[in-house]
């Protein structure tokens, strides 16, 4: 199951039911989005292990296979592997951050891993909830991404793929973000302009909905909802 798509639909539902609430309707929408984002969609540990393997440990080029990795709570062994590969400088030692290929673009794995770890960090039911090692990794990972500015020859990564993962990560750790961390992230997410057609239109609407949740912009969230259902 596509966790981000489910979270998007949950946000739309909460938006329609919370519009008349005087106590910050976007707080409810935002929390609903995070609650659904951090869920694991694997029925048991065996399925989780299979999902991770089938996704080639987050390296799959196929969008559906990649979603297997980000839709579960990573097994403890995989979490420890990622912690072990992570350099104090904010990057993973097995990723080529200078890669610019159109398809299996290596730097995207950086955000895929951060998203998967943020799920565990933000979920109160996870054994890794609030873990200092993961928390430090997430902030260092953001700083490295902002400074390195990886880029692909494929427009999709810059306008859709990167903003999609980054926005979800920022929402899951929103309460811990510094002003500069949020501002730099928003500059990247703003590359997602409304438009295009088909699934790309839906993805762009989702990215703008997340941007609205990050900035408390109810008008933008409503516009994204209208783009989604229009």
Where are these regions (language model features)?
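Alpha-helical structural motif
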Residues: 7, 25, 75-78, 204
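N-terminal alpha-helical scaffolding segments that mark the starts
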Residues: 26-45, 55-65, 69-75
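N-terminal secretory signal peptides that target proteins for export/translocation
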Residues: 1-3
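Boundary at the C-terminal end of the N-terminal hydrophobic targeting segment
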Residues: 20-23
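Hydrophobic helical h-region of N-terminal Sec-dependent signal peptides
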Residues: 5-18
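Aromatic-lined, polymer-binding surfaces characteristic
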Residues: 38-42, 46-59, 80-230
């Amino acid at each position: 199951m596509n966790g981000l798509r489910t979270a998007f639909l949950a946000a739309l539902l909460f938006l329609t039911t919370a519009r008349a609430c005087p106590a910050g309707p976007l707080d409810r929408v935002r929390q609903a989005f995070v609650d659904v984002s951090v869920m694991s969609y694997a029925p048991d540990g065996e399925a989780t292990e299979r999902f991770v393997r089938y996704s080639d440990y987050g390296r799959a080029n196929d969008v559906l296979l990649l979603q297997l990795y980000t839709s579960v709570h990573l097994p403890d062994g995989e979490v420890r592997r990622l912690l072990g590969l992570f350099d104090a400088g904010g990057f993973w030692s097995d990723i080529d951050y200078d890669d610019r290929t159109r398809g299996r673009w290596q730097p995207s794995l950086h955000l895929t891993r951060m998203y998967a770890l943020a799920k565990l960090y933000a979920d109160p039911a996870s054994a890794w909830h609030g873990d200092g090692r993961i928390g430090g990794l997430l902030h260092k990972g953001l700083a490295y991404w902002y400074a390195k500015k990886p880029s692909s020859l494929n427009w999709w990564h810059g306008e859709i793929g990167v903003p999609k993962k980054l926005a979800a990560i920022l929402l899951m750790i929103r309460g811990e973000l510094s002003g500069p961390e949020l501002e730099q992230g928003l500059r990247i997410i703003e590359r997602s302009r409304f438009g295009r057609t088909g699934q790309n239109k839906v993805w762009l609407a989702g990215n703008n909905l997340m941007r609205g949740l990050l900035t408390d912009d109810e008008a933008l969230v409503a516009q994204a909802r209208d783009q989604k259902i229009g």
